[in-house]
């Protein structure tokens, strides 16, 4: 989990998207780092549950979200949650549609589903690295599952900051040009410096970027 992921999570909390009981899918603490349940409790969320494939540190419930929906519902013993968070999990699943569909089934009516996945990222096989999901995938998933994709919280998370993904005319990857509006002084000082020193310049596109998507279950 990156600092940008945590920043987006805190923005969602400030916007009132994280209420009531919260479930984190993929909650194992890696190398002792905090998981989302930890951050949520720091923000005042009192009821948090962590789920993962095995009994690791930070995991309260062992569950396989990769099962067919029928098999998953048969094994799932908990009530639905007001908020379900799935951060940096789907890229490690061979069938992200099934996994996220099972996550949706854990969200109560009127609840929120918060998802973060890398879109441009180095390979990281833990245990496998299978896919990179892009904006159109999220838009289509919402339509097929009767979810509302909350446009204000549908964002690129990158070295250039957090910026809303515009669905029209067509989504584009985050670029340093976006900082021209967000940080104009820094943008022009940096660009002038590269020109004066005749450097190779900076990367036009984010070398690492992720997508944060918030859904409302109708």
Task: Please annotate each region the language model reported.
Residues 20-124, 136, 213-215:
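Conserved SAM-binding loop
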Residues 12-13, 40, 142:
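Hydrophobic, Leu/Ile/Phe/Ala-enriched alpha-helical segments that form helix-helix packing faces
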């Amino acid at each position: 989990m990156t600092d940008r992921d945590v920043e987006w999570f805190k923005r969602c909390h400030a916007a009132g998207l994280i209420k009531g009981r919260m479930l984190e899918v993929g909650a194992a603490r890696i190398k002792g780092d905090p998981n989302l349940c930890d951050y949520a409790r720091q923000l005042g969320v009192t009821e948090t549950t962590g789920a993962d494939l095995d009994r690791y540190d930070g995991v309260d419930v062992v569950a396989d979200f990769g099962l067919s929906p029928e098999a998953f519902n048969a094994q799932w013993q908990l009530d639905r949650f007001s908020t379900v968070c799935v951060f940096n999990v789907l890229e490690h699943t061979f069938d992200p549609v099934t996994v996220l569909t099972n996550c949706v089934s854990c969200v109560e009516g009127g609840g929120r589903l918060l998802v973060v996945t890398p879109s441009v990222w180095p390979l990281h096989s833990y245990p496998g690295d299978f896919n990179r999901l892009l904006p159109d995938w999220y838009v289509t998933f919402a339509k097929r599952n009767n979810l509302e994709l909350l446009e204000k919280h549908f964002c690129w998370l990158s070295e250039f900051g957090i910026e809303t993904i515009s669905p029209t005319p067509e989504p584009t990857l985050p670029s340093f040009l976006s900082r021209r509006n967000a940080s104009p002084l820094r943008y022009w000082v940096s660009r002038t410096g590269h020109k004066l020193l005749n450097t190779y310049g900076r990367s036009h596109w984010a070398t690492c970027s992720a997508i944060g998507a918030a859904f409302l279950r109708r």
